[in-house]
Structures are given as structure tokens and as C-alpha cells.
């Protein structure tokens, strides 16, 4: 019986470690965050949205999308800001990574700002990344229903935006059904081992 107890304890420890292992494939809560549809579908566009579009390949100072992606957004409203926003459902109290890639050339006047639930997390005036893609990352807390948005203006030319994402911080993932299946299979297999041991 002592052998049976030890085997049960060991198997449960292994199975539970599998069940509660962090999910390394974080899901993006945004729709069309990489502008992969070639449009702004999934996004809400508002205010001055003149000269703002989704493009592919080389465009003005930019050689293409971030990381080789096909499409990216170019932002060029004149005189006043345009706004690009999206709402999503998440888990209240959980931590989320809000990230995006941005490129600009220091046009004057120009401005770019990013918001989480209406609170600015980034505000830039005449930003200049040398037309190179630069990643910005922020950690925020979910409320159950949240939103992100960008305000932007570039009178002379364009700024660029790509690969926008909101993902849950790893280590908080609720066990998936497949993990519960692994647990059940492990326990059932243990039962067979114990029975064979006890017959000897």
C-alpha cells in the first residue's frame, strides 16, 4: 500500500504541473491588429481620418510592414488628429500586454499618442524613429471590457503603425480542456500500474 500511495502522489504532481503550466501561445484580443485584411476592418475610425489608409510594400519613407508583414497603416491627417480605436472583452483583474510597432520621420508638425481606456500611455510630438519600426509595450490591468486607441496627425507626410496587440501576461492562463484530459489519462494509467504491482 505504501508503494501505491507514493505512485499516486508522484503521478498527481506530474499531471498537475502539466495542467497549470503557462500557455505560451498568447491570444491577441484585438481583431485585425496587423491590418492583414488590407483594410481597417475590426477597428473604429473617427475624427479627421483624411490621408489615413492601409498599404502594402514601400510607401513614402517606409520600405514595408514590420517583420515582413504584408500590410500596415499609414497615418497622415492634416490640421487635426484622426483616431483609430478598438474595444475588446478580457478578464477583470488580469494583467495584459498592450504593444504595437510604430515608425516616423520627425515631420513638423506631427503627433502620435496611444491610450488604454482613454488614459494616455504614450504621447509624442514630432516623433522620429528614422523610418525604422520601433516597438512600444505597456502592461495594463483588465476590467472585463476595455479599449485601446491612437490619436495622430502628420501634416507634411505620414507616420506608420503595425502589429497592434493586447495579450494576457503569461502565467495566468486557466487550464485548457486538453490539459484536463492529460490529467485524467495520467491517473487512469497509474491505476493500471498499481494493479499490476499489487498482483505480484
Regions of interest found by a model, annotated:
Residues 20-26:
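Sec/Tat signal peptide C-region and signal peptidase I cleavage site
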Residues 35, 82-107, 138, 148, ...:
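Extra-cytoplasmic beta-strand recognition segments
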Residues 36-72:
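Extracellular glycan-recognition surfaces and repeat-rich motifs
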Residues 71-83, 126-129:
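Extracellular beta-rich ligand/substrate-recognition surface
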Residues 107-116:
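Beta-strand acidic-aromatic groove motif in beta-rich domains, primarily in extracellular
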Residues 150-157:
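Short beta-strand-plus-loop segments that form exposed binding edges in beta-rich domains
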Residues 175-195:
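A short, hydrophobic C-terminal helix/tail in secreted or cell-surface proteins
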Amino acid at each position: 500500500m505504501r508503494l501505491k500511495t507514493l505512485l499516486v502522489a508522484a503521478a498527481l504532481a506530474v499531471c498537475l504541473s502539466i495542467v497549470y503550466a503557462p500557455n505560451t501561445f498568447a491570444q491577441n484580443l484585438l481583431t485585425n491588429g496587423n491590418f492583414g485584411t488590407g483594410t481597417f476592418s475590426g477597428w473604429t475610425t473617427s475624427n479627421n481620418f483624411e490621408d489615413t489608409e492601409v498599404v502594402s510594400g514601400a510607401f513614402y519613407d517606409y520600405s514595408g510592414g514590420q517583420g515582413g508583414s504584408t500590410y500596415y497603416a499609414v497615418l497622415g491627417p492634416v490640421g487635426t488628429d484622426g483616431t483609430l480605436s478598438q474595444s475588446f472583452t478580457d478578464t477583470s483583474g488580469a494583467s495584459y500586454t498592450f504593444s504595437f510597432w510604430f515608425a516616423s520621420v520627425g515631420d513638423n508638425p506631427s503627433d502620435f499618442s496611444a491610450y488604454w481606456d482613454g488614459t494616455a500611455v504614450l504621447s509624442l510630438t514630432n516623433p522620429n524613429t528614422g523610418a525604422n519600426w520601433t516597438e512600444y509595450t505597456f502592461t495594463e490591468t483588465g476590467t472585463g471590457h476595455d479599449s485601446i486607441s491612437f490619436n495622430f496627425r502628420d501634416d507634411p507626410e505620414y507616420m506608420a503603425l503595425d502589429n497592434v496587440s493586447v495579450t494576457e501576461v503569461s502565467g495566468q492562463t486557466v487550464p485548457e480542456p486538453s490539459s484536463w484530459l492529460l490529467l485524467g489519462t495520467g491517473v487512469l494509467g497509474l491505476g493500471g500500474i498499481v494493479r499490476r504491482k499489487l498482483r505480484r
